[in-house]
């Protein structure tokens, strides 16, 4: 699993960003809070990563803090 990524912030969209790590661009889904705290484009950024694998997709979710990541894990574990 990927636990953390550090690279250059290449692109930012609504709910996502692309982090370039040594020439590989990772599409990472993020909260608006995480995006708002991100530095300007082409600056270094580190994110804690939660990998979500399903039959039909492979998603990376990025967080500024481990606490925010833990809350995400709680939310996705709730049944119903």
Range-by-range predicted roles:
Residues 7-9:
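Conserved hydrophobic positions within beta-strands
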Residues 11-80:
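Long, highly charged, low-complexity intrinsically disordered interaction regions
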Residues 1-5:
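Short coil-to-beta-strand transition motifs
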């Amino acid at each position: 699993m990927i636990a953390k990524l550090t690279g250059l912030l290449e692109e930012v969209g609504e709910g996502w960003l692309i982090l370039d790590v040594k020439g590989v661009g990772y599409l990472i889904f993020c909260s608006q809070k995480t995006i708002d705290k991100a530095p300007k484009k082409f600056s270094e950024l580190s994110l804690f990563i939660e990998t979500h694998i399903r039959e039909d997709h492979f998603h990376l979710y990025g967080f500024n803090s481990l606490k925010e990541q833990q809350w995400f894990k709680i939310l996705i574990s709730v049944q119903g």
